[in-house]
């Protein structure tokens, strides 16, 4: 089961979502998250911090985390 995290409300509840029994993966919808957070770019520090929080919640709860990235170098930035 994949939980798609793509808005500020989901970010606010990320630890509770990651703790749900049966969730296998947190998938970051970075562009939707960017819009929801009122940022102009997915590279905005607010969005970068949000993605880091999602990754940390995934690690803390033993969940995989996924996100589309344009290159493998970009993926290495997050994972």
Features from the language model and the residues they span:
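Expand to "…catalyze enediolate/carbanion chemistry for C-C bond making/breaking, isomerization
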Residues: 1-79
């Amino acid at each position: 089961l994949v939980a798609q995290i793509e808005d500020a409300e989901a970010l606010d509840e990320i630890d509770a979502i990651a703790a749900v029994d049966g969730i296998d993966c947190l998938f970051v919808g970075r562009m939707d998250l960017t819009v929801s957070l009122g940022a102009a770019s997915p590279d905005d520090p607010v969005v970068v911090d949000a993605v880091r929080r999602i990754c940390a919640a995934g690690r803390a709860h033993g969940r995989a985390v996924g996100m589309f990235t344009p290159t493998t170098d970009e993926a290495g930035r997050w994972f």
